[in-house]
Amino acid sequence: MSRERATALLVDFDGVLRRWDPAVAAGVEREYGLTEGVLGEIAMSWGLLQPVLTGQVSHAQWMVSVADALTPAVGADRARAAVQEWQSYRGEVDPEVLAFVREVRAAGVRVGLGTNATDLLDADLAALGLTEELDVIVNSSVVGVHKPAKEYFQAACEALETPPGRVLFVDDEDRAVAGARVAGLSAHRWSGPADLRYLRAALAY
C-alpha cells in the first residue's frame, strides 16, 4: 500500500533555509587570538546547548556562558567582544529554498519551520525577512523539547493542523530525520538544492 502524499511541509532552519558562512567565525577567532573552531565547539557543547534549546536559559545567557569559557584564554573583555562580534552575523537565507517555500505555499501547502532554536529566533526571522514567509514556527525553546524527540514532532503536527502521515519533514541531520520517521512523518535528509525536485514530487500540489 502506497503512502499518502504529504499536504504539509516542515522544514529545518539552520542548514536548510538558513546557511552560515564558516569564514565569519574563523575570522573572529583569528582576530582575537582564539583557537580555530573554539567558538562553535564551546557553544555547541551539550551542557550549554541543551538548556537554551529547551527554553531553560535565554540566548543572551548562553552567550555569557560562552564568553565565560573563553575568559581564561583571552581575558573577560576580549572574550565578550569576540562573542559579540561573532553573534552579530545572523546567517543568510538560501534563495532556492525560500523560492521553494513560496512556491508550495502559493499552491496551498502549509509550511512550518521546524527548528531547534533559542529565544532569538523571532528576531532572526525578522532580520532575514522571513516573518511572513511561513505559516507556522515550531521553536524547540518554546515547545520545551527539541528534535529528534517524538514529542517535538507531535507538537509540530498539531501546529500544522495536519496528521503526521501527511507531513513531509526536511532536515540536514540524520538524527532529526530518524526521529521524525519514528513519529510517523515522511522525512528527507537534505543535501542541497538538488533535492528540491524530489521534494516537489513528494508533495501533493
Question: What spans do the regions from the language model cover?
Answer:
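Alpha-helical substrate-recognition element adjacent to the catalytic core
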Residues: 29-66
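Active-site neighborhood of HAD-like aspartate-dependent phosphohydrolases
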Residues: 2-44, 182
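Hydrophobic alpha-helical core bundles mediating ligand binding, dimerization, or RNAP-core interactions
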Residues: 25-28, 43, 62-67, 83-87, ...
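Metal-dependent phosphoesterase signature
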Residues: 52-98
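Substrate-recognition element of Asp-dependent hydrolases with the DxDx(T/V) motif
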Residues: 78-126
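Asp-based, Mg2+/Mn2+-dependent phosphohydrolase catalytic module
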Residues: 1-11, 118-205
